[in-house]
Amino acid sequence: VRDHNGPCLEQFWDGWGAHLDFTRDGDRAWWQAGLQRQVLDIGIDVGWNDNNEYEIWGERATCHGFGQALPMARAHALQPLLMTRATFDQQANNKPDERVYTITRGGPPGLQRYAQTWSGDNSTSWHTMRWNQRMALTMSLSGLFNTGHDIGGFDGPAPDAEMLIRWTQACCLVP
């Protein structure tokens, strides 16, 4: 993904980085080769795409668009879908006789064909646990039938024993 200065640099957790452009054959092939070499070849059978919401907000940011430049403002949902499909396809090519399991945080329309998603980085609280259950049911009604959450929360203090037990029990019932 580029802007007028070259690759679009965005703030990630530990520094600046750039997103791959999955509308470009070379970027997609690079991703799949890395997935094969660094994950599948060492025996890990699950693909997990994280931090793939493509939060690129520069007005001049564009992607390759399969040969016709496309403003990123119109491709925010497309990129995570294509990333997830590339992950799914590489897993399927690696073990064609086995069922593919992929999880992805970016949750665009069409995702259910390739992966499950989860609610993202949630907080350790009773409120969040209740909210996540509502979110899972709503996502399921919207066609994302396989969803999940960070049990016990991702951010905040460690859950006490009761909260962790209740959260685990609740997530056993998530669609």
Regions found by a protein language model. Name each.
Residues V1-P175:
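Catalytic-domain carbohydrate-binding cleft regions of carbohydrate-active enzymes
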